[in-house]
Design a protein with these regions (language model features):
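Structural preference for beta-strand elements that scaffold enzyme active sites
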Residues: 16-20, 68-71, 101-103, 122-125, ...
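C-terminal functional extensions of proteins
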Residues: 218-252
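Conserved anion-binding
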Residues: 24-25, 37, 42, 110-181
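Conserved N-terminal beta1-alpha1 strand-loop-helix module at the mouth
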Residues: 1-87, 96
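Active-site-adjacent beta->alpha loops and helix N-cap segments on the catalytic face
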Residues: 79-94, 110-113, 128-141, 187-199, ...
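Short, acidic/polar
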Residues: 48-62, 110-118, 168-169, 213-216
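A C-terminal functional module that forms or caps the active site or interfaces directly
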Residues: 52, 182-232
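N-terminal active-site wall of soluble small-molecule enzyme domains
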Residues: 64-120, 153, 189-192
Length: 252
């Protein structure tokens, strides 16, 4: 199973840290953006190619730093239409060539369309509020259900009570029973503790979460979860993040 490959890769890397790739054109260095504008003219094409170069540099950083996985935000590229989809495909191919586990954050409700194509990533994220249909069984691929989001109005739905638990917990339990990983974006230890208590065997993907708040997600051997960091830009950033995580979580 693909989830088992991910956990094996994290154990091999001796770190639960993954690199999040969600660039905006504003992050691209001005000289680099200007270079593409001089070649291609101002507009979406130049911006998209600048994003491609920038994202490939981040992927190279993950490879050189020995990280096991990357999580790519589809929304960073798909607004550019077919050009953005091409960049996204290039990143998935490059991650595969570098033997980096690649998850694309599509937040789709129909993951089969993305996981059965020729250039499919190792896993995708889904929004589970359509029910179990968003967690199909696809050989050697993983699905991660985004059950707890950090957007301002997320709690309007996620905190509704379903029986004796919040709706996000009820959905997480259903998705976990189908073999999905669970995505938590809030960074709050209480959310992490509750999901780990209710879903003891589920793999948790934690975004915007420091080592202290992430600790409840891991077992005594440092297994069972992954922390995604979107702020890493240099090798020293990665090493600092690894060291900080290791103060709380050690993979055996």
């Amino acid at each position: 199973m693909s989830m088992e490959r991910l956990q094996a890769a994290l154990r091999k890397a001796k770190s639960p840290l993954a690199l999040g790739i969600a660039p905006t054109i504003g992050e691209v260095a001005a000289p680099l953006k200007k270079q593409f504008e001089e070649m291609l003219g101002s507009g979406n094409l130049a911006d998209c190619e600048a994003l491609r170069y920038h994202a490939m540099q981040l992927l190279e950083l993950a490879s050189e730093s020995g990280l096991a996985a990357v999580v790519i935000d589809a929304d960073s590229f798909l607004p550019y239409g077919m050009m953005g989809a091409d960049v996204l495909g290039n990143l998935v191919s490059a991650a595969r060539a570098k033997e980096i586990y690649c998850i694309v954050d599509y937040r789709t409700t129909r993951p089969a369309a993305y996981l059965t194509c020729e250039n499919a990533p190792d896993g995708v994220t889904v929004l589970p509020y359509v029910g179990g249909d968003c967690v199909p069984t696809i050989e050697n691929k993983s699905i991660f259900a985004t059950v707890r989001t950090d957007n301002e109005t997320g709690g309007e739905v996620q905190n509704l009570i379903a029986g004796d638990r919040p709706l996000y917990v009820a959905l997480a339990m259903q998705c976990a029973r189908r073999g999905a990983g669970l995505v938590v974006e809030t960074g709050y230890s209480l959310d992490v503790k509750e999901l780990r208590r209710r879903c003891p065997s589920a793999f948790l993907m934690l975004k915007h979460c420091d080592g202290e708040n992430a600790t409840p997600a891991f077992d005594d051997y440092g297994h069972g979860a992954m922390v995604v960091d979107y702020t890493l830009r240099k090798a020293e950033d990665v090493e600092k993040a690894k060291k900080s995580l290791k103060e709380w979580v050690s993979i055996v």
